[in-house]
């Protein structure tokens, strides 16, 4: 490792040279109490910026051991430091001038949820922060003094004010850690109390707009109905009161615009911890919960959907069903089976985004179209056994059909944004209109031995010889999906993906699986289990192409890993 003085000399020696001379700077340099690494140098000033990292030893950083005692506190601390670092570098970004991206200093932008990102990682050795710098140039000629200003003036100030405990707002960090530990305590108590979710009194559920996840100002705070009100005991905040949603089948009903979908949206994102001031800090959902919807046109490969669909007129085998263009009902059936495979114990559904013929068939329709002519066993007839046999609870928003009233264990009416427990009232009415007994096919747990086929790279021969295989390249399209090689992976309807960096990580994982794990024998669960173990022990660096991992990735849940793999068109 070289000293910072060597970097300064090297910089001065390449001033006004052609831009590729910047590549000679690649390496690690000792800057007092931290190490600066130039991991990748951009090809020209208009290309993606250079990849930089800094490492501060645990001793020099000086953070209390309690803040990195487990995975929860490490992720929370890293998230907090990333937010602080972004605030610091925003003061200096583009203050060094030049062409293209000259002077850019950027890091991951964190939203309302707390994610494990490669932008900052806490290990037993210390803190590693990763970010981007646009190396300055005039045209395509190196402007060394401007980069010197960034590396020797701007960056040291940002690092000192972010990654050293003595220099930060210690009380603010303590409250951040305490909040995370309180949130974790609620998650643990959900299981003890046989709940699928908790919504604290005073929570602010509505968001600012359709393109903002910030809380809406002047909105109605959440108040729990007395019959569902419970108390959670938290290690730092003490007692907190709110609505506990029991395991089983819960129906959320109400008039239009009364807050049904707003509550469901808060619950679907309750699988993540939220930052202080978000309004949903204490909206906590079972972390395996999966939002499901119909998804016309998606790809399905070898999924046993026979629990819901059988005896298709084209004689297609629904025990191992495949299609490149799923209907609404088959896509939703596949989503449920795939969710079971991913270990989800709670399904979240909204009537508005579900396939009607998949969810319910009323008595009139059953009289007109006999069961022998209908291949679909509706979700209505499977929801109870999903809970009693498979242990999977359902939260369903309904606004037009009362079909689920008979089977629901808990019924919540949203009335002017306030929840009301109407279970007893509805059950009394249901008693006047008993359900006719239906001949429902036996509930048989689906079978799964699905595999991902081995990747066959495209071979290009240039002139003579056999040519070399193309490596799979990833192009991320925000949260919506990514292009892997020539194959588009569409994730638009995977609604619990909240950050493009999660999508980027999914591309990385799928690429690795296709290149190193898929052999035509390993099942998807076997592959995902291997990936999960690697993430737990090594992090995403285990799947990087080179010797370093850049900023720009966030670890997704196992449910989203399955969702991604299931949407890859083999």
Predicted regions and their residues:
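Flexible beta-alpha connector loops of hexameric P-loop NTPases
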Residues: 298, 308-329, 361-376
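Glycine-rich phosphate-binding P-loop
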Residues: 240-272
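Phosphate-binding/switch loop-helix module in NTP-utilizing enzymes
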Residues: 320-354
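Conserved P-loop NTPase nucleotide-binding/switch module
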Residues: 340-383, 387, 400-406, 410-427
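N-terminal accessory targeting/assembly segments
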Residues: 1-185, 189-194, 205
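Conserved NTP phosphate-binding and transfer environment spanning the P-loop NTPase/kinase superfamily
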Residues: 388-391, 397-570
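N-terminal pre-Walker A segment at the start of P-loop NTPase domains
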Residues: 206-241, 276, 284-289, 293-300, ...
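Carboxylate/His-rich catalytic cores and anion/metal-binding grooves
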Residues: 193-195, 201, 257, 264-295, ...
């Amino acid at each position: 490792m070289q000293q910072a003085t060597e970097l300064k000399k090297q910089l001065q020696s390449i001033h006004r040279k052609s831009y590729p001379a910047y590549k000679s700077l690649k390496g690690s340099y000792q800057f007092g109490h931290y190490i600066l690494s130039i991991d990748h140098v951009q090809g020209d000033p208009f290309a993606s910026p250079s990849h930089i990292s800094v490492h501060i030893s645990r001793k020099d950083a000086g953070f209390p051991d309690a803040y990195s005692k487990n995975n929860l506190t490490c992720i929370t601390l890293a998230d907090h430091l990333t937010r602080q670092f972004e605030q610091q570098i925003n003061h200096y970004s583009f203050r060094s001038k030049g062409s293209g991206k000259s002077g850019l200093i950027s890091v991951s932008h964190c939203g309302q949820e707390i994610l494990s990102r490669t932008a900052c990682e806490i290990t037993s050795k210390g803190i590693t922060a990763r970010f981007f710098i646009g190396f300055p140039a005039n045209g395509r000629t190196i402007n060394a003094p401007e980069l010197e200003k960034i590396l020797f003036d701007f960056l040291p100030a940002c690092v000192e004010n972010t990654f050293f405990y003595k220099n930060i707002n210690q009380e603010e960090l303590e409250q951040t850690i305490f909040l995370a530990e309180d949130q974790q305590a609620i998650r643990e108590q959900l299981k003890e109390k046989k709940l699928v979710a908790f919504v604290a009194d005073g929570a602010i559920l509505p968001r600012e707009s359709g393109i903002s996840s910030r809380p809406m100002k002047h909105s109605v705070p959440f108040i729990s109905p007395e019959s569902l009100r419970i108390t959670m005991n938290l290690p730092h905040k003490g007692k907190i009161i709110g609505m506990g949603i029991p395991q089983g089948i819960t129906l959320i009903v109400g008039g239009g615009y009364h807050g049904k979908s707003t509550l469901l949206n808060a619950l679907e994102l309750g699988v993540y911890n939220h930052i202080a001031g978000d309004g949903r800090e204490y909206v906590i959902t079972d972390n395996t919960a999966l939002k499901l919807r119909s998804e016309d046109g998606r790809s399905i490969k070898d999924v046993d959907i026979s629990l819901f669909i059988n005896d298709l007129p084209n004689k297609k085998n629904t025990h191992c069903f495949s299609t490149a263009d799923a209907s609404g009902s088959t896509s939703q059936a596949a989503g449920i089976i795939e969710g079971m495979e991913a270990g989800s114990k709670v399904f979240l559904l909204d009537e508005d985004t579900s396939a009607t013929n998949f969810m319910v068939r009323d008595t009139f329709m059953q009289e007109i179209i006999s069961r022998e002519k209908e291949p679909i066993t509706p979700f209505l007839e499977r929801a109870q056994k999903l809970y009693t046999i498979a242990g999977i609870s359902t939260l369903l928003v309904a606004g037009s059909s009362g079909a689920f009233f008979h089977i629901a264990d808990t019924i919540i009416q949203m009335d002017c944004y306030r929840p009301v427990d109407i279970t007893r009232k509805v059950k009394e009415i249901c008693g006047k209109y008993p359900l006719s007994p239906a001949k429902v096919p036996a509930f048989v747990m689906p079978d799964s031995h699905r595999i991902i086929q081995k990747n066959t790279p495209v071979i290009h021969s240039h002139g003579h010889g056999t040519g070399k295989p193309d490596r799979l390249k990833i192009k991320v399209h925000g949260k919506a999906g990514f292009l892997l090689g020539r194959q588009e992976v569409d994730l638009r309807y995977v609604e619990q993906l909240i950050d493009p960096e999660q999508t980027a990580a999914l591309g990385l994982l799928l690429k690795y699986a296709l290149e190193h794990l898929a052999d035509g024998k390993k099942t998807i669960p076997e592959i995902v289990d291997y990936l999960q173990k690697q993430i737990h022990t090594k992090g995403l660096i285990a799947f990087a192409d080179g010797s370093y991992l850049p900023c720009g990735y966030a670890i997704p849940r196992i449910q989203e890993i399955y969702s991604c793999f299931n949407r890859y068109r083999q």
